[in-house]
Amino acid sequence: MNIILVTDIFGKTPALVKLSEELNAKVIVDPYAGVDMAFKDEAEAYSYFMENVGFEDYLSILLEMTESITSASTLIGFSIGASIIWKLSENNSVKNVNRAICFYGSQIRNFKKVNPLFEVELIFPKEEFHFDVLELQNELSKKENVRTTKVDYLHGFMNLYSTNYNQFAHNEQLNWLRINAS
């Protein structure tokens, strides 16, 4: 099984490269064509992403990559990467993705009508500022091909560069991914 990581707004960072090695992921999809942008903080990363890439262009990057996949693959996405995976999951031109694991995809709340064509595991943080996590989790868990989990950590807990990074949570979820992503 191929594992493909789909990054958040920070893009391809040294920490994400390390995660890809730990999971034996063959591909990292990011919005900046593989360039480490070395953002100083989340505000800078968000501003740059919104001004220079945006949701739809990042979705197009992922769609183009997934259309070239020739063997069964699992997508693992973080934040905006998780949200674009969610949106992609309803596209019937995507043939060789059989599973996705999406960490804290907060923009999923704007695409509640999506009906995934492959299995999607949504991992929600304990809370989000812009919406009720439990309400969204309950709504989406009723859909076919969707499983939801709410963890006791904040949005960004897997990202070393996030103010909400949590080493314990990162290690816990890394171990879970090693068992469940392949």
Task: Give the residues covered by each predicted segment.
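A conserved short beta-strand
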Residues: 94-106
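C-terminal catalytic histidine-bearing segment of alpha/beta-hydrolase fold enzymes
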Residues: 146-182
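Serine-hydrolase catalytic machinery in alpha/beta-hydrolase-like enzymes
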Residues: 1-70
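Short beta-strand/loop motif that positions the catalytic acidic residue
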Residues: 121-124
